[in-house]
Amino acid sequence: MKAVVFTLGCKVNEVESAAIMAELESRGWEVSDELSYADIYVLNTCAVTKEAERKSRQLVARVRKFNPNAPLYVCGCASQKDGGQFKKGGVRAIFGAREKQQVVSAIANDFGGCDCQKLGFPKQVKTRAFIKIEDGCNNFCSYCVIPYLRGRVTSRPLRDIVEEVKACPAPEIVLTGINISAYDDGGQRLAGLISALQFTDKRIRLGSIECNVIDEKLLIALKGLKDFAPQFHLSLQSGSDAVLRAMNRHYTRAEYLEKCALIYTHFPDAAITTDIIAGFCGESEKDFEDSLSIIGEAGFSRVHAFAFSPREGTRAFSLPDLSKTVKSQRLHRLLEAGKAAEEKYIKERLGRRYCVICEEYDGEYTSGYTEGYIKVYVRGEHSGKLKVRLTEPFRDGASAIIDGQ
């Protein structure tokens, strides 16, 4: 029997969907993440923005039209926020954000198990694995609905994470979660977890982190890893102190820049990426200019920008919203500034040597990512780790030649 699992939203959703797929495979199901004819469909939804919820509903309708008689199981943040929005789609069962472990059990109950044979070839090992270390968030930023849907922080036992790292066949591991900065297993914080991973030769990369967790202890622990990818996705949201206060972000522009400087002290070639919201409630032109200017001051290598989307149930929902035109114009300017910052970051690193883990071959070039997450293209078919030298900007990254010296 065949199951198709669709995923919308964040890396945590991807990890949780992968767990559902693995469990189904272990029970004999053939699984896929592409739209095709199947016996059942699972949709892991997102609710971070109105658009994400709309896409979730749209996907339900698309699956229903494609295969109207197959059972559809919906889970995730959008169904946690409002499960009723999916009932019109003829959905078999609806689960919240913290009920995803029940999806496979429900499928087993409905189908009475599965006695079909497992596929006779090994599952492909991906080059990058995402390991979830915690769930939930206690920050309650004024614009964010996720803490209400995911709940308070719950951290996985450190020993379980260590065992998963040991067992993981992928050469690169990304530590992920809703708010990994809040990781705490009986007093063992993120720095303690990093120290416990210093045995592994795998490349370790961090998911999105918050300002408060950046300190000497964490950075020293990261330097102790055998292969750390110094790419820090340090969430910003705004470069304006007034907007940061309204967002309930608990740091100032100056404090954020101090954290960036501390990172560069320990990792001079670090890549710092970030998120910025365009057009938050009450954002003045001066506030917005502060967000634009910090892109250069912080030396970001990449900026993920998006327009503010008011979410019901958050404190910002009742605040006066800016017009769609203003938000759209500001978003465009942020995206342009972010693109220029990324181009600058790449150009400054041409001629330098990096280690790339090969991921894909398109018939002409093998591609993979540097420690700082520059996508690199090397002519010819290659595998494993490559020592390369960046030569010039190319496609969505840089071309490179093999340099084994």
Regions found by a protein language model. Name each.
Residues 124-126, 137-139, 228, 238, ...:
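Short flexible coil/turn linkers enriched for glycine and charged/polar residues
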Residues 318-405:
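Terminal RNA-binding accessory module
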